[in-house]
Amino acid sequence: MTPELITFGRYLAGEFENQRQAQAEPVWYVHLRLWLRPLPLFREDSIALFAEQASIINLDQPYRPRLWRLTHSESGGLEVRHYMFNDLKSVQGAGKNPDILRKISLEDLTFLPTCTLAVKVNTLADNQYQFIAQPQPEQRCQFTYEGTTYQVALGFEVTSHSLKTYDKGLDPGTGKGIWGALLGPYQYEKKRDFSAELDV
């Protein structure tokens, strides 16, 4: 793994909250906690992160579990591959429960080939970077779970201390946004650092 990929993983591995944003604009942004927890999968060439979030007032009801695989693209750049869990309920709560995390295996996952993000790297200062993950042009992230087809628009920006997420759900028929970052990104600050859990 390259130093660039490892830095990308270190920036993302953590527990994040958008407390300031939610206090400033409570009508538009729910106060969320987001977990990005390292997993010992794809270790030969990638960093795997379990992603999950919850409203602060319902931390015992996390939702949107998914797996991010940070790796290199065929062209040599960085990319983020998204995986869906075959049984969402079986992994619910893994963001704050390492016992559930440890039980996750490759057999629990389905790769979503239309949901891969290309990553651009900007140098901000000495040893300080910004990673911007965006979908490929004309790419539609669609998948089916329990007979229902979903479409989402994905994307994020991360630095050593902050994370902006652009994820939003779309109506597959009209393409209109129905949930998520409809008025701009969710703006998170890192509250806990999980980079020590990375196997690099």
Curated annotation (Swiss-Prot):
Similarity section: Belongs to the CpcT/CpeT biliprotein lyase family.
Pfam families, A to Z: CpeT (PF06206)
Function: Covalently attaches a chromophore to Cys residue(s) of phycobiliproteins.
GO terms, molecular function: lyase activity
EC numbers, comma separated: 4.-.-.-
Lineage per the UniProt record: Bacteria, Bacillati, Cyanobacteriota, Cyanophyceae, Oscillatoriophycideae
Signal peptide start-end: none
Gene symbol of the encoding locus: cpcT2
Protein name stated in the entry: Chromophore lyase CpcT/CpeT 2
Keyword Lyase: yes
Domain of life according to the entry: Bacteria
